[in-house]
């Protein structure tokens, strides 16, 4: 679970340094994808959902690595294709988070333990709504520039709250998981 938490941390939290059009993200999202992949391997015995999430983590890791390199070299674009690819990447991030919640729900049922998945799901819903709102505003933003800018700020702040809530819920889930006895292999 430690890798799951840190994977989401690297995936959702951005600290960027910008110099002359070159952007250095100090917490590269592809590192988060790699940590998630490792976490999925560790939790594979808890639920097959974790195994099924691995290709999504790999694909998202490749995409975010290419974006990270492009930002570093200053060749990233602000085109419509970038926006559409960003929407797809956000959808994959949300799908991975949803899959983790579902996998942990199965582990809760199997182990008869609370792993804080209800709080994780509520935080995930905040992320889902804010992501949809941000991209909808971004796509219609050219027509209503001043209103769209104000709405985007509100949605981004709500998204930040959602990220914090989700990371706190994953952290609590991690702590609850760590005190569980080792999973017994069924003969």
Predicted regions and their residues:
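Juxtamembrane "helix-exit" motif on the non-cytosolic side of transmembrane helices
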Residues: 16-19, 69-77, 136-147
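Internal transmembrane alpha-helix with an interfacial aromatic "cap," most often the third helix
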Residues: 29-56, 68-71, 97-111
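N-terminal topogenic module of multi-pass integral membrane proteins
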Residues: 1-39
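Membrane-helix boundary/juxtamembrane motif in polytopic membrane proteins
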Residues: 50, 102-133, 175-187
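C-terminal transmembrane-bundle signature of multipass membrane proteins
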Residues: 97, 129-187
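Membrane-interfacial loop-to-transmembrane alpha-helix junctions, especially the N-terminal start
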Residues: 1-5, 47-58, 120-123
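Generic alpha-helical transmembrane segments
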Residues: 29-33, 63, 67, 86-102, ...
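Non-cytosolic membrane-interface motifs at loop->transmembrane helix junctions
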Residues: 77-89, 147-156
């Amino acid at each position: 679970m430690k890798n799951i938490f840190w994977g989401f941390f690297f995936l959702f939290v951005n600290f960027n340094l910008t110099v002359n059009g070159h952007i250095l993200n100090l917490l590269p999202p592809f590192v988060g994808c790699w940590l998630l992949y490792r976490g999925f391997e560790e939790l594979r015995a808890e639920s097959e959902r974790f195994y099924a999430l691995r290709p999504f983590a790999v694909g998202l890791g490749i995409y975010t690595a290419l974006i990270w390199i492009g930002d570093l070299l200053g060749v990233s674009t602000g085109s419509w294709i970038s926006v559409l690819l960003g929407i797809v990447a956000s959808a994959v991030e949300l799908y991975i988070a949803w899959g983790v919640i579902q996998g942990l729900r199965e582990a809760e049922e199997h182990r008869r333990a609370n792993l804080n998945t209800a709080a994780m799901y509520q935080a995930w819903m905040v992320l889902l709504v804010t992501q949809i709102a941000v991209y909808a505003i971004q796509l219609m933003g050219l027509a209503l520039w001043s209103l769209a800018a104000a709405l985007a700020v509100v949605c981004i702040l709500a998204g930040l709250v959602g990220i914090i809530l989700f990371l706190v819920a994953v952290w609590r889930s991690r702590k609850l998981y760590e005190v569980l006895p080792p999973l017994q292999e069924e003969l």
